[in-house]
């Protein structure tokens, strides 16, 4: 009887912890997306240039690893907003590039709507079914290296359709990451809401950029 009561108490405590992580993650994610969007708007309105690729890589990975190091302290929140603000800054020049196209406004609107639909749809699916998506870890690892190789190839060779294939690959990769990370929170694989937020934010960012490229290419063929 005592063992059953202990198991019940443990299950209740675990469920409370999961609910807390989910609540904190989605709350912080909403704030970082809003902050990132504000920075992107300012960057776009000021017509700031897109930074050098090395600046982007150093800025992103530097702030990312800083966030990992500070994830268990209040400073982790500061570095989280620094990272997402930096990514918002890089988004501004990209939006200006698409706004310069004849159908740029509709491309951005379509990419934004599809990103929201995919994120909310996948999140709702995992939260409702509570399926364990840990089996996606192998696909995610393999997908990362395949996409990395494809990106490197695209830097040196002009292959017809490769950019579209890379963008489609990133859509699948980002979708898998959303499923995996949401499932990890539910099933105990992730208990740090800062890391969960960063993972979901990066997935949403990559998903949006990839959909922008796909809709932009499709619109250019019209």
UniProtKB/Swiss-Prot annotation:
Localization: Cell membrane
Bilayer-crossing regions: 26-46, 48-68, 75-95, 107-127, 139-159, 166-186, 198-218
Record keyword Cell membrane present: yes
PROSITE patterns, A to Z: BI1
Keyword set, alphabetical order: Cell membrane, Membrane, Transmembrane, Transmembrane helix
Topology in membrane: Multi-pass membrane protein
Family annotation (Pfam families): Bax1-I
Keyword Cytoplasm carried by entry: no
Major location (coarse): membrane
GO-annotated molecular function: calcium channel activity
Domain of life: Bacteria
GO biological process entries: negative regulation of apoptotic process; regulation of proteolysis
Cellular component GO terms, alphabetical: plasma membrane
Family as reported in the entry's similarity comment: Belongs to the BI1 family.
Record-given protein name: Uncharacterized protein PA2604
Organism ancestry: Bacteria, Pseudomonadati, Pseudomonadota, Gammaproteobacteria, Pseudomonadales
């Amino acid at each position: 009887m005592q063992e059953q009561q202990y198991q019940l108490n443990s299950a209740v405590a675990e469920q409370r912890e999961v609910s807390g992580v989910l609540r904190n993650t989605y709350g912080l994610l909403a704030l970082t997306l809003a902050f990132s969007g504000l920075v992107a708007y300012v960057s776009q309105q000021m017509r700031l240039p897109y930074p050098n690729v090395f600046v982007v890589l150093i800025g992103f990975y530097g702030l990312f690893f800083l966030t990992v190091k500070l994830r268990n302290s209040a400073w982790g929140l500061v570095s989280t907003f620094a990272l997402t603000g930096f990514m918002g800054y890089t988004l501004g020049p990209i939006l200006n590039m698409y706004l310069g196209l004849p159908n740029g406004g509709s491309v951005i609107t379509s990419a934004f709507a599809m990103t929201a639909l995919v994120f909310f749809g996948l999140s709702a699916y995992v939260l409702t079914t509570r399926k364990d998506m840990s089996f996606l870890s192998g696909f995610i690892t393999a997908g990362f290296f395949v996409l990395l190789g494809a990106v490197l190839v695209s830097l040196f060779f002009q292959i017809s359709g490769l950019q579209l294939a890379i963008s489609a690959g990133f859509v699948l990769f980002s979708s898998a990451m959303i499923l995996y990370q949401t499932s990890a929170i539910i099933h105990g694989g992730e208990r740090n809401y800062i890391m969960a937020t960063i993972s979901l934010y990066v997935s949403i960012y990559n998903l949006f950029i990839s959909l922008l490229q796909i809709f932009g290419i499709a619109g250019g063929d019209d």
